[in-house]
């Protein structure tokens, strides 16, 4: 049988309190919890999945970034507008892509861009 890669599920630093991070990602960013055990949890939204890991090492979070393509970028920007996070402007970049950045309370940076 030929080897075929499936999906990628990045490990996402959650900060020192996993429950606070879960609350942010579930109630704020619209993910759903798939599982939780000990210092880890799995979250998912529309096929995009992460494994949250409780950690106290801020440099990991400050150096973690993820780029996620979405349909409905304008609506997502409005949805995330009231989050307790740093939200950058929604803008067209010089390379021709509309996007915005969000920095979660843990320090993780998300770049969201319009698909198509």
Predicted ranges, named:
Residues 3-6, 58-63, 93-94:
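Short glycine-enriched loop/turn motifs at secondary-structure junctions
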Residues 1-3, 77, 81-116:
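Vicinal oxygen chelate
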Residues 27-33, 84-85:
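Conserved acetyl-CoA-binding loop of GNAT-fold acetyltransferases
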Residues 32-64, 109-114:
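Conserved short beta-strand elements that form part of the metal-binding/catalytic scaffold
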Residues 1-22, 66, 116:
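N-terminal beta-strand motif that seeds the catalytic metal site of vicinal oxygen chelate
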Residues 62, 74-79:
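Short amphipathic alpha-helices within nucleic acid-binding modules
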Residues 40, 49, 67, 87, ...:
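Short hydrophobic/aromatic beta-strand element in the GNAT-like acyltransferase core
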